[in-house]
């Protein structure tokens, strides 16, 4: 009798599981909406996700799924909202429930939107390429299979420099999360001359700027004398004003001006450079002092050209971000497969040993002719896997 009860229990469990797996949801039948989009929580992201789904379902079928909130969900509805604990930031879970509803829950930030994009791509056959350039198959009936799909982006920030970036749908479709949006306005890379403009400070305080060939040289492409305590004090005053003008923003770039080998070579700076084995040592020491002065802010700096290699001794504090640049590398082969790339890889591996707060600015371009076609799809995955292995977050 006990064995019979166990057997019956197993059969009931298998029946329940099979019914869940086979559950389908029909959104549109014969050109008429049979489902609703239910906002579990009303907020800007969920509403944007719902509108995107409604828009493309209408493009496919000419039917409009109603968007509702503050109502009890029923069988066949799509539920947008709710927290998915196992998904990371911008992650999501698409899950068909036992009562034939599709739940789109989020790990945070834009997770619900990216869940809708995945639903449209993977289960409705929509491909989006550029502004108003997309493909889909018109259907009078849209039926979804049972779904269980969870994703979290491998990188916190994802950015491409593309003419399509001004299209909001393109940015959502390709899950682009612009780090630039996190920074205080106009304080995004090469900021030394914006924080302490040489036109304003250079004449009275040339000692703030790089000592090159026997004299301090203020200028748009000059750097700071980072061992001069007066430079730190002046930078703190400027930054304090900037932070007060942008109280809701926490991230700023304090980074070298564009140009190579323009760093300060005064005796004090030179001594630090030699001890640290790289001019980046002076930068990180300076940034760490700023990070201690403003512990609630995050400071980004460049590891670029002369500062690409990491320091031997000093380590960035947790609120100091390293933006590592591979500008000197060849790009027709993966970074690991050429000498210039291997020099960058050495720098990347060195930084990853002392920081887990690293961005990579990857120049997927041919500088010899920037407007000519430059096939690089075959190298992207290997490079991206290299970045992920070394704690890169963008």
Q: Language-model segments: what does each one mean?
A:
Residues 311-317, 324-366, 383:
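Glycoside hydrolase catalytic-domain groove-lining segments
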Residues 66-90:
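Short, well-ordered secondary-structure micro-motifs within conserved domains or adaptor modules
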Residues 1-26:
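Bacterial Sec-dependent N-terminal signal peptides
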């Amino acid at each position: 009798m006990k064995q019979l009860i166990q057997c019956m229990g197993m059969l009931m469990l298998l029946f329940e599981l099979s019914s869940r797996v086979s559950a389908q949801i029909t959104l549109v039948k014969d050109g008429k909406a049979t489902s609703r989009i239910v906002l579990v929580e009303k907020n800007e992201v969920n509403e944007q996700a719902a509108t995107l789904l409604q828009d493309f379902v209408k493009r496919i079928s000419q039917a409009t799924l109603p968007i509702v909130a503050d109502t009890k969900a029923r069988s066949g509805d799509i539920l947008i909202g709710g927290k998915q604990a196992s998904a990371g930031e911008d992650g999501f879970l698409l899950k068909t429930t036992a009562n034939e509803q599709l739940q789109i829950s989020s790990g945070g930030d834009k997770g619900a939107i990216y869940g809708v994009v995945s639903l449209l791509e993977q289960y409705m056959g929509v491909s989006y390429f550029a502004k108003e350039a997309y493909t889909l198959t018109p259907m009078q009936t849209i039926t979804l299979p049972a779904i269980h799909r969870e994703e979290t982006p491998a990188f916190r920030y994802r950015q491409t420099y593309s003419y399509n970036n001004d299209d909001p749908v393109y940015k959502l479709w390709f899950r682009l999360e612009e780090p630039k949006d996190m920074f205080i306005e106009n304080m995004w890379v090469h900021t030394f001359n914006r924080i302490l403009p040489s036109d304003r400070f250079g004449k009275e305080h040339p000692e703030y700027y790089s000592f090159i060939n026997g004299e301090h040289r203020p200028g748009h492409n000059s750097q700071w004398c980072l061992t001069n305590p007066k430079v730190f004090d002046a930078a703190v005053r400027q930054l304090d004003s900037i932070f007060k003008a942008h109280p809701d923003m926490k991230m700023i770039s304090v980074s070298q001006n564009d140009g190579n080998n323009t760093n300060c070579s005064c005796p004090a700076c030179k001594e630090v450079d030699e001890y640290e084995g790289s001019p980046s040592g002076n930068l990180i020491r300076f940034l760490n002092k700023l990070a201690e002065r403003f512990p609630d802010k995050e400071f980004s700096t460049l590891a670029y050209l002369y500062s690409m290699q990491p320091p031997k001794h000093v380590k960035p504090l947790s609120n100091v971000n390293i933006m590592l640049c591979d500008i000197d590398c060849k790009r027709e082969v993966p970074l690991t497969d050429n000498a210039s790339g291997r020099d960058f890889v050495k720098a990347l591996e060195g930084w990853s040993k002392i920081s887990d707060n690293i961005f990579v600015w990857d120049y997927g371009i041919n500088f010899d002719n920037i407007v000519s076609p430059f096939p690089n799809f075959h190298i992207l995955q290997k490079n991206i896997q290299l970045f992920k292995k070394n704690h890169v977050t963008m």
